[in-house]
Amino acid sequence: MIERRLTRSTVVRGGLALAAGGTALAAWPRETISARSAKQDAEILKFALVVEDLQSAFYAAALDKGALDGELLEYAQVVAEHEKAHADHIRTALGSDAPVAPNFDFGDSVGSPESFATTAIKLEDLGLSAYNGAAPGLTSGALADAARIVSVEARHISWIRDIVGKIPAPRPTDKAISAKQAQAAIQATGFVR
């Protein structure tokens, strides 16, 4: 058994490490968030619905194309159900304020197992990052709902990364992006018509 001795130098080093960690955490970039409100929740949920509709339509298109088999097919079938359930849940929460789903065209991104997997990773990462970026602006009730969805989104990205032989969780934390960044990323896909 290794014995640890508490010396003045270990206490000082520990205190310096703690102070440095606190300074680094204080420097963590934060977006300015307006006061949380039900109205802001609705705006965030409207955008989350676009992300979920995009993902849901992508998996449906991939299944319709019929280019998948084995583990990728199983992944697409399971995740298609999840994404549809997420979109339905948000649509129900928004009620009559829910926007109509945009039209999407996924072109060659669903034409082969490789292009499907590459696109799935990008879309799942986008969704996860968008939820993480929106979280600070949500009221506690909406945040709890979003947490139940984002935890599943994290499983999706880990699963598809594992299928293609990538590290399932390559970073100790997931990135967060602003709504503007997420909107730009969605437009950059070229999938929205």
Where do the model's predicted regions map?
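All-alpha RGS (Regulator of G-protein Signaling) helical domain and cognate RGS-like helical scaffolds
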Residues: I2-L6, R13-R193
